[in-house]
Structure formats: structure tokens, C-alpha cells
Amino acid sequence: ILAALYSVGKPELINDRFIAFHVSGGTTEAVLVTPDDNDIIKAEVVSESTDLKAGQAIDRTGVLLGIDFPCGPELEKLSLGSNENFKIKPTMIGMNCSLSGIENKVKKMISDNCPPYDVAKFAICSVCESLSSMAEAVTDKYGNMPLVFAGGVSGNKMIAQTLKNRFGAYFAEP
């Protein structure tokens, strides 16, 4: 968390409450961070994926499309060929998201011969909308505060730009 603050050039956030997201193949979590006199910060996971993690959804989609693992950057490049505007309603259970439906939908799209660039964009947009729903749920409950994203998936430009526009979020270098 402290490395992410350093990366985004906001070390002063350590003195305030903020939400730190870690979005990778191993975790998809939102952590409420509060200052603590004894331990510098206190961190509490307040929202997470209940099954598949964001990076897993991205990589599994890429592998299904024949992209070498890890797939994030190549999947993002492929998605740029799509002009589709997907209407995505993330699966939320309270403040937590479920991402396993992305893989199921991707498999169906591939079997229905959807263009690979549309499949790629669908997967990325699905992850983005899930992260957006997590951010909305957390800020609805805990109040508006800075959002700091870190982890490999946060390097996706489409996801980063969308969440910056919606929430003024900060993104650490992956």
C-alpha cells in the first residue's frame, strides 16, 4: 500500500482514510486504509471478488483466444479493434463481486464465432464494470475518499482511464 502511494505521488494520503485496490491474478480486493499511531496504517479488506480474480479473467480470456500468458497487454491491444459498446451489469453480492461469469460468457462468445477483438473488449469491460461497482459500493458505505489502484490489471489503460474519469482514482505503476 505504501509503495502504491509512493508510485502515484501521494504519500500524504497516509494521513487520511482512503481505499486501496489491489487488482491482479491473485487478488481483487478493496482495502479501507486508516492512519494508525502504532502501526502507521490499519488496513481492512472491505470488498473482494468471491471467485475468479480480475487477472485470472483477463488471462483466461487471452489464452482462449490464443494469446501467450500473461495476456493483459496483448488482450488490451486486441480489444482496440472493437467498436462494440457492451452493456454490462456486474454480479455483486453485497460489496463483493463475482467474476466467474466473465469466463463463461467469453467461452460462449467464442463458440458463437464472435470476433476476437469483441471478446477481448467484453472481458476488459466486464472487469472494469466490476471494479467500478466495487468502488461505488465501498464509497457508498464509507464515504467519498481517494481510491488508489495497484497490481498488474491496473496497468490496463482502458480500465485506468474509465476509473479515473468516474472516481478521480490514482493508479500505481504495475
Each predicted region: which residue ranges?
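Short glycine-/acidic-enriched loop or helix-start segments at secondary-structure transitions
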Residues: A4, A30-V33, M158-A160
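Conserved phosphate-binding catalytic cores of ATP/NTP-utilizing and phosphoryl-transfer enzymes
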Residues: I1-F18
